[in-house]
């Protein structure tokens, strides 16, 4: 790989990491190409990106994006996205099905985190689920009021 190619990769990754709310580092030793392709498909469905990058290039790109505090060792596959919960869910769900896929560390909400924090974020409801819960909470008083009015109407009709 030439210096210009490395510089291009660093520039692209730096821009990607600046926009990302979470970057997760995972070990993928022993996984087949087809399983990694399944990970990429899962990630694409959640607007999350997956890439294997050399540790030195990733470290430079992360520092350019003001993300420091995590040391990269051994082989790593990087998973990143704008939604911390969705990115964490992609990694956690894939790790459940593939024991060789191990979450090592991460930046979650742009702060250094361990695998336990990634697992905790994966258990949170997603954005759509939270919006549905909020709408249901807002609609509860109106729904109860409507049910009460309907019961009152039925009672008056019977009398």
From Swiss-Prot:
One of its GO terms (biological process) is translation. PROSITE patterns: RIBOSOMAL_L10. GO terms for molecular function: large ribosomal subunit rRNA binding; structural constituent of ribosome. Keywords: Ribonucleoprotein, Ribosomal protein, RNA-binding, rRNA-binding. InterPro entries: Ribosomal_uL10, Ribosomal_uL10-like_sf, Ribosomal_uL10_bac, Ribosomal_uL10_bac_type, Ribosomal_uL10_CS_bac. CDD domains: Ribosomal_L10. It comes from the Bacteria. It holds the Pfam family Ribosomal_L10. One of its GO terms (cellular component) is large ribosomal subunit. Belongs to the universal ribosomal protein uL10 family. Forms part of the ribosomal stalk, playing a central role in the interaction of the ribosome with GTP-bound translation factors. Part of the ribosomal stalk of the 50S ribosomal subunit. The N-terminus interacts with L11 and the large rRNA to form the base of the stalk. The C-terminus forms an elongated spine to which L12 dimers bind in a sequential fashion forming a multimeric L10(L12)X complex. This is Large ribosomal subunit protein uL10. It comes from Sulfurimonas denitrificans (strain ATCC 33889 / DSM 1251). The lineage of its organism: Bacteria, Pseudomonadati, Campylobacterota, Epsilonproteobacteria, Campylobacterales. The gene is rplJ.
């Amino acid at each position: 790989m030439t210096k210009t190619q490395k510089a291009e990769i660093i520039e692209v990754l730096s821009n990607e990491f600046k926009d990302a709310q979470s970057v997760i580092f995972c070990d993928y030793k022993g996984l087949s190409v087809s399983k990694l392709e399944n990970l990429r498909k899962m990630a694409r469905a959640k607007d999350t990106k997956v890439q294997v990058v050399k540790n030195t290039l990733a470290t430079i790109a992360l520092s350019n994006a003001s993300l420091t505090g995590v040391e990269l060792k051994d082989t790593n596959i990087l998973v990143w996205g704008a939604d911390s919960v969705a990115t964490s869910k992609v990694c956690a769900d894939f790790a459940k099905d593939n024991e060789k896929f191990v979450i090592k560390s991460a930046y979650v909400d742009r702060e250094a985190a361990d695998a336990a924090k990634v697992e905790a974020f994966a258990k949170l409801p997603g954005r759509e689920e939270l919006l549905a819960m909020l709408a249901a909470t807002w609609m509860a008083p109106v729904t109860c009021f409507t049910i009460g009015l309907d019961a009152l109407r039925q009672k008056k009709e019977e009398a």
